[in-house]
Amino acid sequence: MGSGWHEWPLMIFTVFGQCVAGGFIVLALALLKGDLRAEAQQRVIACMFGLWVLMGIGFIASMLHLGSPMRAFNSLNRVGASALSNEIASGSIFFAVGGIGWLLAMLKKLSPALRTLWLIVTMVLGVIFVWMMVRVYNSIDTVPTWYSIWTPMGFFLTMFMGGPLLGYLLLSLAGVDGWAMRLLPAISVLALVVSGVVSVMQGAELATIHSSVQQAAALVPDYGALMSWRIVLLAVALCLWIAPQLKGYQPAVPLLSVSFILLLAGELIGRGVFYGLHMTVGMAVAS
């Protein structure tokens, strides 16, 4: 019982991975629109490096959870049959295709057609990666607190909240501005509203879930307080992002960086609660 902090490597891996998948979609769409000058496009591609740094941190964290890099390779033995193997394989493919394509694009070795293909394929791989994360937990019918609609909603809402902000931050770092960027805060705000509703509904549902030895509501006694802090951090993060725009200013990169850090903190709290809610339907008591 607790807040799930003992699973911090998985918290980092899943939250960072979902934000990176969403952030890549934002940058890819900016490049696919075709209204950026060549030098601006190259700056956007250069700023994609931030995505791969975050993804690298996520994979390092996942290896710490597994204990050694060799276990990561061994976990690929059951691709197609194991949700965990599928998650690691899909994440590795997303990271490899995205990273190698980024390097070739940086070196200007991709033709316009190949670059377009790379962007589209990597966007799809990112979404598949997030879905494979969902399946690791949502396919376990003996864990009723994960075997529900709240798991896919929670994971994809992280992508819809963190992705637009991360993409906006990197586009700003690249010196890109445009009317389409103003749509990104609206996506994150909508995701935050939905996430708040999900938190309340999931909290109410916990009272109805129990095994012969355990009550789901007792797994994270501070569920309400933790989720409240999460929503507050997310709301502050989005306010820091949106407030300057309401006054007609472009948010500064340092302010956007603080905003993204606060968003990560909020989502890590939420993901910790998610792992803290692990329980089984049998006689075992989750620790």
UniProtKB/Swiss-Prot annotation:
UniProt membrane topology term: Multi-pass membrane protein
One GO CC term on file: dimethyl sulfoxide reductase complex
UniProt keyword Oxidoreductase, yes or no: yes
Single Gene Ontology BP annotation: anaerobic respiration
This protein's UniProt keywords: Cell inner membrane, Cell membrane, Membrane, Oxidoreductase, Transmembrane, Transmembrane helix
Regions that span the bilayer: 10-32, 44-66, 90-107, 115-134, 157-174, 183-201, 225-242, 255-280
Residue numbers on the Cytoplasmic membrane side: 33-43, 108-114, 175-182, 243-254
Molecular function in Gene Ontology: dimethyl sulfoxide reductase activity
Localisation per UniProt entry: Cell inner membrane
Protein's UniProt keywords contain Transmembrane: yes
Ranges of the Periplasmic topological domain: 1-9, 67-89, 135-156, 202-224, 281-287
Family, per entry: Belongs to the DmsC family.
Role played: Terminal reductase during anaerobic growth on various sulfoxide and N-oxide compounds. DmsC anchors the DmsAB dimer to the membrane and stabilizes it.
Oligomer status and interactors: Heterotrimeric enzyme composed of a catalytic heterodimer (DmsAB) and a membrane anchor protein (DmsC).
Name the UniProt record assigns to this protein: Anaerobic dimethyl sulfoxide reductase chain C
Species name: Escherichia coli (strain K12)
